[in-house]
Design a protein with these regions (language model features):
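Structural alpha/beta core scaffold segments of enzyme domains
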Residues: 1-202
Length: 202
């Protein structure tokens, strides 16, 4: 809804705040990014910004509500889809001499990349360049171009096999946000999720 920068402006090296109200996925529906001349200036400023969030339709989503919805959908014969359409599972289970029934659950897990999500972006001669460790640059180019409102040939991703991923680095959020902030700032930027932010946005 609004961002109060008054305390952040007292921090040496603070540049400003980039506000993205649209987001780019159903879950990530908006961001506020603190810009600083150094990482520590930006990190301190991020904590000093007072943001009045519009929490939207996901405001009550939690690990428990996700689990509850999963169980509800599993019990609904009309939800989901079938991978295998052969045989009669119900008949087979009914007539089986030996059966093993169990429920295995685990908590939602953090990917735990070796280094938090980060990227460098800058625009040169009308082309946005993004440098980072990423696992799916084809995906990242298309999504970043769409977020910037340009054709895919106006985005170049430079891939580094670094940082660990475990699947987390297939997501385009860090690329999109870094490119948007670079466009907003009109200068090269390095966007770094703190470890806490990395866990929050995983």
């Amino acid at each position: 809804k609004s961002v109060d920068e008054s305390e952040a402006k007292k921090i040496d090296g603070y540049i400003g705040a980039y506000v993205n109200k649209e987001g780019f996925t159903r879950v990530n529906t908006g961001y506020v990014v603190a810009l600083g001349e150094t990482y520590w200036a930006a990190e301190k400023a991020a904590k000093a910004l007072k943001v009045d969030w519009d929490l939207g339709e996901n405001k009550n989503v939690s690990s428990k509500t996700i689990r509850d919805e999963s169980i509800r959908l599993q019990k609904d014969p009309n939800s989901g889809f079938l991978w295998v359409l052969e045989g009669d599972t119900d008949k087979g289970m009914k007539n089986a001499q030996n059966k093993h029934t169990a429920v295995y659950e685990t908590e939602i897990a953090y990917h735990g990349c070796l280094e938090p999500m980060n990227a460098v972006a800058f625009e040169k001669e009308g082309i946005m360049h993004i440098h980072s460790g990423h696992q799916s640059f084809t995906f990242a180019v298309g999504n970043t171009a769409a977020a910037l409102g340009v054709e895919a040939d106006k985005v170049v991703c430079h891939q580094y096999y670094a940082g660990g991923g475990f699947g987390r680095r297939t997501e385009p959020d860090c690329h999109i946000l870094t490119a948007q902030v670079a466009k907003f700032a009109g200068r090269p930027v390095k966007l770094i999720y703190s470890r806490e932010q990395d866990m929050m946005f995983d």
